[in-house]
């Protein structure tokens, strides 16, 4: 009785690894901030509850939040996106699903960097699309000429993520502009996952939407404001792309029959996040940077590893000691939880992903264990 569509979806390898862990493991696997949601955001949601804001919101989200998202895009990236071209979603994950399900038919090709966040692959398969990998070099760079060579008449989307999960790579202006030009030249659409746009240490974030209208910009509140459980994200499209495809109305058709709307009182929390002081974000990023430096310095003499530019992941090559699954299992046996790189695509088979979104002291303990095993 189970549909073939469901049967074809593989369980998350990340969750499978977590199931092997015991409660006394040092968790360097989880991809969420260990900080609590800032108090002013919580208080705003409480006020919304007290004021009876517990009913359905408009399908595309409360107007005040969409207006504030529009302001953010203007202030941060000089993008002019009308609030009516924004949908507030149940996390950025729903925004990804809406983008793929709205645009991909059976057999349509989707270009995805490999390794990448696992959902890009699974959602493409769910839509019965065909995955075409964009291979990365040892520094996780994208070869734009190889991207062009991968394009056929069936290619419709490029899914792109900067800062990257799992690599921590922040792509430079030239790469992002180059992808935008490819989208223009080949009539493709870029689905740009920008959920880590504020968690950057040494570089600057650029959005493909700064260089092309053929972009769906996806973001959320989970990573920036430590709001993973709130499930609030959004997508934004240019007026030109929306006029061409009536994209917002088509996405709303899927959204209204699956989720109806994002949780109303949580939307008021997100509104407070954007309107309030951003010091909480600056403080979290400062702490993440300290942890990044700690874990990079601890791993660089053991594994071949690139220093992350953003997000809160580091992705070392462990092939000197075995493949990623073997090394991850050995670490779990020694009470350090990580994720084998193959969970993010076959090109990650020789890697493991550590998250440093955990306490500084726990990272120090984990590094001590790692050194005992591999040095």
From Swiss-Prot:
L-aspartate binds at residues 31, 165, 353. InterPro entries: Aminotransferase_I/II_large, AspAT/PAT-like, NHTrfase_class1_PyrdxlP-BS, PyrdxlP-dep_Trfase, PyrdxlP-dep_Trfase_major, PyrdxlP-dep_Trfase_small. The modification N6-(pyridoxal phosphate)lysine is found at residue 223. Signal peptide: none annotated. Its main location: cytoplasm. The keyword Isomerase does not apply. Its cofactor is pyridoxal 5'-phosphate. It catalyses: L-aspartate + 2-oxoglutarate = oxaloacetate + L-glutamate. Its EC number is 2.6.1.1. Disulfide bonds: none annotated. It holds the Pfam family Aminotran_1_2. It comes from the Archaea. One of its GO terms (cellular component) is cytoplasm. Keywords: Aminotransferase, Cytoplasm, Pyridoxal phosphate, Transferase. GO terms for molecular function: L-aspartate:2-oxoglutarate aminotransferase activity; pyridoxal phosphate binding; transaminase activity. One of its GO terms (biological process) is biosynthetic process. The keyword Acetylation does not apply. It is found in: Cytoplasm. CDD domains: AAT_like (cd00609). Homodimer. Belongs to the class-I pyridoxal-phosphate-dependent aminotransferase family. PANTHER family: ASPARTATE AMINOTRANSFERASE (PTHR46383), ASPARTATE AMINOTRANSFERASE-RELATED (PTHR46383:SF3). This is Probable aspartate aminotransferase. It comes from Methanocaldococcus jannaschii (strain ATCC 43067 / DSM 2661 / JAL-1 / JCM 10045 / NBRC 100440) (Methanococcus jannaschii).
């Amino acid at each position: 009785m189970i549909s073939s569509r469901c049967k074809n979806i593989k369980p998350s390898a990340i969750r499978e690894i977590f199931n092997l862990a015991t409660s006394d493991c040092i968790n360097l696997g989880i991809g969420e901030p260990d900080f609590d949601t800032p108090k002013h955001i919580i208080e705003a949601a409480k006020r919304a509850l007290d004021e009876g804001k517990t009913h359905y919101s408009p399908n595309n989200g409360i107007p005040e939040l969409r207006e504030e998202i529009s302001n953010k895009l203007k202030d941060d990236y000089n993008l002019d996106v009308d609030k009516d071209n924004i949908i507030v979603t149940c996390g950025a994950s729903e925004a990804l699903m809406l983008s793929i399900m709205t645009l991909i038919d059976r057999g349509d090709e989707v270009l995805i960097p490999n390794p990448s966040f696992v959902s890009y692959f699974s959602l493409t398969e769910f839509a019965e699309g065909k995955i075409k990998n964009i291979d990365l070099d040892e520094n996780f760079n994208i070869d734009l000429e190889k991207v062009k060579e991968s394009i056929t008449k069936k290619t419709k989307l490029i899914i792109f993520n900067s800062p990257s999960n799992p690599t921590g790579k922040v792509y430079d202006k030239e790469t992002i502009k180059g992808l935008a030009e490819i989208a223009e030249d080949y009539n493709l659409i870029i689905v740009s996952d920008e959920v880590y746009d504020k968690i950057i240490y040494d570089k600057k974030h650029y959005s493909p939407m700064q260089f092309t209208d053929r972009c769906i910009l996806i973001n959320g509140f989970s990573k920036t404001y430590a709001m993973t459980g709130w499930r609030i994200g959004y997508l934004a499209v240019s007026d030109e792309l929306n006029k061409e495809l009536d994209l917002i109305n088509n996405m709303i058709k899927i959204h209204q029959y699956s989720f109806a709307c994002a949780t109303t009182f949580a939307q008021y929390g997100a509104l407070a996040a954007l309107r309030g002081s951003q010091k909480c974000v600056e403080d979290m990023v400062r702490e993440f940077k300290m942890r990044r430096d700690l874990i990079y310095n601890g791993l660089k003499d053991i594994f071949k590893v690139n220093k992350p530019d953003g997000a809160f992941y580091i992705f070392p090559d462990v092939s000197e000691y075995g493949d990623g699954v073997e090394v991850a299992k050995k670490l779990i046996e020694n009470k350090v939880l990580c994720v084998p790189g193959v969970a993010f695509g076959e090109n990650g088979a020789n890697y493991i992903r550590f998250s440093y979104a955990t306490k500084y002291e726990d990272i120090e303990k984990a590094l001590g264990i790692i050194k005992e095993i591999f040095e």
